[in-house]
Design a protein with these regions (language model features):
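Residue-level detector of conserved, well-ordered beta-strand and adjacent loop positions
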Residues: 27, 43, 62, 80, ...
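Ligand-binding loop in jelly-roll beta-barrel domains
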Residues: 80-83, 89-105
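Short, acidic/polar N-cap/turn motifs at the starts of alpha helices
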Residues: 11-13, 23, 37, 65, ...
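A structure-centric signal for secondary-structure junctions around beta-strands
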Residues: 34-36, 55, 100
């Protein structure tokens, strides 16, 4: 059994940021459970591009709003608290963050 809090992660090597986003990586590959789990916060007013080549990513937006764009098809999806998206095809995508977003993924 693994039990952690975000306070346990804060300020460690599992607390990663890149200017406009911050990811608290609660479960990682070295935990040997076959998946990862993160709490990610993205700053309002930012635009970020992401691409996960080696894993499927499920994202549940618990706070905030913005726009998700599939960069391969141009398809756009409005996001708000309660939205979920699944990147099961390793899609390159962009997140435009209108209100600060907090995601569990």
């Amino acid at each position: 059994m693994i039990v952690r809090t975000t306070d346990d992660i804060t300020g460690t090597e599992r607390d990663v940021s890149d200017g406009t986003w911050r990811s608290k990586r609660i479960i990682l590959a070295d935990d040997a459970v076959g998946f990862s789990f993160h709490e990610t916060t993205i700053q309002a007013g930012s635009v970020n591009e992401f691409h996960y080549q080696y894993h499927v990513e499920a994202v549940w937006l618990v706070e905030g709003s913005g726009l998700l764009t599939n960069l391969e098809t141009g398809e756009e999806h409005p996001l708000k608290a309660g939205s979920m998206y699944l990147l099961n095809g390793h899609e390159r995508h962009r997140i435009r963050c209108d209100e600060q977003m907090r995601m569990l993924c």
